[in-house]
A protein has these predicted regions:
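Catalytic-core regions built around general acid/base machinery
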Residues: 117-128
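N-terminal helical cap/lid subdomain that shapes the substrate entry/recognition surface
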Residues: 4-18, 22-116
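Short glycine/proline-centered loop/turn elements that form peptide/ligand docking sites
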Residues: 22, 119-120, 197-200, 215-224
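Short amphipathic alpha-helix with an adjacent loop that forms part of the alpha/beta core around
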Residues: 5-6, 240-250
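Short acidic-hydrophobic, aromatic-tinged amphipathic segments that line or gate anion-handling sites
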Residues: 232-237
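Substrate-recognition "cap/lid" segment bordering the active-site pocket of phosphatases
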Residues: 130-131, 135, 139-192, 198-202, ...
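Conserved S-adenosyl-L-methionine
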Residues: 208-210
Length: 251
């Protein structure tokens, strides 16, 4: 089988999802979600499954969308509440605030690391003239990239703060990826997207991007990534090669 490749004679920029692709945060997110949902679900429904429920309903989505999607899968509807709700209150915002506090407490205590294979791929791409972007649905996406010490490897960084300011819908809508391509001054067919979450892979497919790379996270299913639109599926970005180089733009 030939090596999976990013061909820089065809692709001139690469957009990376932050959580689970650039930063090793998926376990922390899943654990924070489980703690919050299990507290809420006690006496209402079965506990949150840290693999299946996380991957199917929450991973890759904006926080509040993830809450709505997961609770809908259990036949539960909550009032929206407001951004000043008490963390853990039985509202969409209340659960979201509790999850946010729990996750960021872990980050503040333990820090966050970047995946070495992703860092190596970023260096290879940039040495060959490709532009790069990091995209996150999280309000803390920028902080996570900075904490991992890799912000210098990206020309563009978009997170949940940008989405809120611009009123951009979350994945599986491709709006965040399309905004990244716009800021990179590239059209979608010139851009590859690397994502580990099913909504992100679907968003890249629906956005018409030139290459969609799915990374199989812990408990992930390669077949599902392909079904959602990944043209290349790998367990680790060390398996992705880079061919050619991006030629300088000429007037």
């Amino acid at each position: 089988m030939s090596e999976p490749l990013i061909d820089l004679t065809r692709i001139s920029a690469v957009v990376f999802d932050t959580d689970g692709v650039v930063t090793d945060t998926a376990r922390g997110h899943a654990a924070a979600w489980k703690h919050v949902f299990d507290e809420f679900l006690r006496g209402r429904s079965a506990p949150f499954d840290i693999r299946d429920d996380y991957l199917r309903h929450v991973d890759g989505r904006p926080r509040l969308d993830g809450i709505r999607t997961f609770l809908a899968s259990r036949g539960i509807t909550l009032p929206e509440g407001a951004a000043d709700d008490e963390p853990g209150a039985p509202t969409v915002h209340g659960l979201g605030l509790a999850k946010d506090l729990g996750f960021m407490a872990q980050v503040d205590k333990y820090g966050v690391a970047a995946f070495p294979a992703t860092v190596a791929l970023l260096h290879a791409l940039r040495q060959r003239g490709a532009r790069t972007a990091a995209v996150s649905a999280s309000l803390h996406g920028g902080k996570l990239v900075n904490s991992a010490g890799v912000s210098h490897l990206f020309d563009v960084l978009i997170d949940g703060n940008d989405a809120a300011l611009m009123n951009l819908p979350g994945r599986p809508d491709p709006a965040l990826f399309l905004e990244a391509a716009r800021r990179l001054d590239r059209t979608p067919p010139q851009v590859a997207v690397v994502d580990a979450a099913l909504p992100g892979v679907r968003a890249a497919r629906d956005g018409g991007f030139g290459l969609v790379v799915g990374v199989v996270g812990e408990g992930g299913d390669p077949a599902e990534l392909r079904a959602h639109g990944a043209g290349v599926v790998v367990p680790d970005l060390s398996e992705i090669g880079v061919r050619g180089r991006v030629l300088p733009l000429t007037s």
